Amino acid sequence: MTDLIPQRLALLIDIDNGSAAAIDGVLAELERYGRSDIRLGFGDYEHTSAAWREACIRCAIELRHYPVLAMGSKNAADIALVIAAMDLLHGGGVDGFAIVSSDTDFVRLGTRIREAGLPVYGFGPWGTSERFRKACTRFLFSENLMPDTPAHPAIIGRRPLQEPRDAGNEIRDAIARLHPGVGGWVGVEDLDRELVRHAPDFDPRTYGKRTLLELLKAQRRLTVSQYPVGHWRVRLMSGASKVGGI
């Protein structure tokens, strides 16, 4: 997804605003970018769900306890997460950050890390604010990372997947930015990067497809071809440049 492939990632989890059911998917996703050698969770241990306590033990996540003693201290865990992130950022030794939360309080943290030249991978539910999603280099909806089984009741009632055609305009616009006009070929890898650059939360899984290539093949007004073996390209068909043409 990105040209910068960090080798050592710091995973910071806002326990109060993250889903334990998605943690395995989060860790699997992070393997695409590097190693999550540092794994820290922040929250009130006494009020932390059994699912999170089990996940922290199983996934070697250090849970840092910040009790909610009064209304005035309800943000103690959030503040601790930010302090830990700044310590890691200025101490060096990490190549990127992953933040699990839906809290808009971390918007500035995300932009600050990116200003320092490091990528930020965000993870949160459908309801995560657009501001936080756009503050990340890449944002993944936790619902897209959960196994769709009865063993995970947290995903019951999840938002229905969008139809592949719902991604049409976004795909068309990205192709047009890379190659204005109709008929010009664009590499699928280049298109992938452009889609995420413009919309960090773009994910084929939101539209029911595992990969971008599968999503492209499901579009009506695109031509997809292989060149040479193992490399794919795509172009707009005549008439696809109109709104709703894909």
Short names for language-model regions:
Residues 118, 126, 151-246:
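N-terminal regulatory modules in eukaryotic regulatory proteins
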Residues 1-90, 119:
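Domain-level signal for Mg2+-assisted phosphodiester chemistry and nucleotide/NA-binding surfaces
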Residues 110, 116-119:
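P-loop/Walker A NTP-binding module and the surrounding RecA-like catalytic core of P-loop NTPases
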